């Protein structure tokens, strides 16, 4: 590339200024003599400015190239159903960049949860606090204080008027979300309480703990009405089926169990993971038929009562589980079979959620990625790399507004718009 006379003059002037400002006296005099260039105050710092501009432009080019590569991957990953083409609002997926980055917690984020009706969300942190945010504006609303140790999990009842939280301080707290007052503190677990979930009716609350038990509480009174025993180690997470009849739990003992809430009995135990099972989620009612599933045929649907635990667990459909073995497994509850194993995460899988449209599963993990899995194809169709600067610990869907939220060990929450 040949420089014009004006460009040469500008370059020589900026180099001369650089020699002078860096006190390279001999180089300054020699260069000035050879080029016949004089110092010009207008060119003060010009070389440094151009250099930093080039670096910024290089970074932008690299970012754009990465985005183009990701979009090309989406377009080539299977067309309308699983790929980037033909997707409507109901099956929109998260796309970078994030809409908001919410900062304020002083330690890692353990749980995020959207309010069922309003444009509010809550976050629970190792800093022993719960924070309330407006996820549309990205504004911080308030902090709920009461726990004396890390807040491990949070959940709303169906009305959004009651918030439950659980903590490493061995307690569960119920908060009136209209006044933000703590109205009840539940005692009963003997170790870190790691997960809490309301049943769909809101009448009962389910909790799991490092004490190896699951407890069922009466929300109105705060009384423990059942204790479910069966796991041999820390019960990490629990999830409740859409009809409220069945719960599933996962544990450090590398197993998943399903339970009859009414009878307090274990219905079935699932073993295929080779490490701690960190997370799990029941499928949505509108999930697509999974290839090889008993439920994918009319005849099979009539036979669900023959599965482990009988008709009750069979009616719950499918269960997704994520593990420290870096895999996600899809289980057919009617037969107890593992239908699919998703491989792609490079570290622990920390949270899984079925997309409300029933076609996709989303996951996050310690590899700092958000991944989208096409259930019909049984493969990852989208990856958001470096979604956080540290491990991603939690994920939630907003069911009334197309957003997801993620929380990480980097102490921040990110809100992502689905599009």
UniProtKB/Swiss-Prot annotation:
Biased composition (Basic and acidic residues): 87-100
CDD domains: WD40 (cd00200)
Start-end of each WD repeat: 104-145, 147-187, 188-227, 230-271, 272-341, 344-385, 387-419
InterPro entries cross-referenced by the UniProt entry: Dynein_regulator_LIS1, G-protein_beta_WD-40_rep, LIS1_N, LisH, PAC1-like_LisH-like_dom, WD40/YVTN_repeat-like_dom_sf, WD40_repeat_CS, WD40_repeat_dom_sf
BP-aspect Gene Ontology terms: adenylate cyclase-activating G protein-coupled cAMP receptor signaling pathway; cell differentiation; cell division; centrosome localization; establishment of mitotic spindle orientation; Golgi localization; microtubule sliding; phagocytosis
Subcellular location: Cytoplasm, Cytoskeleton; Cytoplasm, Cytoskeleton, Microtubule organizing center, Centrosome; Cytoplasm, Cytoskeleton, Spindle
Any Pfam family matching the protein: WD40
Molecular-function GO term, any one: microtubule binding
One GO cellular component, as annotated: microtubule cytoskeleton
Coiled coil: 52-79
SMART domains: LisH (SM00667), WD40 (SM00320)
Assigned keywords, A-Z: Cell cycle, Cell division, Coiled coil, Cytoplasm, Cytoskeleton, Differentiation, Microtubule, Mitosis, Repeat, Transport, WD repeat
Main localization, broad class: cytoplasm
Occurrences of domain LisH (ranges): 7-39
Chain residue ranges for the region called Disordered: 74-100
Domain observations: Dimerization mediated by the LisH domain may be required to activate dynein.
Stated family: Belongs to the WD repeat LIS1/nudF family.
Assembly and oligomerization: Interacts with dynein and mtaA/CP224 in the cortical attachment of microtubules. Interacts with rac1A.
Function description: Positively regulates the activity of the minus-end directed microtubule motor protein dynein. May enhance dynein-mediated microtubule sliding by targeting dynein to the microtubule plus end. Required for several dynein- and microtubule-dependent processes such as the maintenance of Golgi integrity, the coupling of the nucleus and centrosome and dynein/dynactin-mediated interactions of microtubule tips with the cell cortex.
Protein's recorded name: Lissencephaly-1 homolog
Gene: lis1
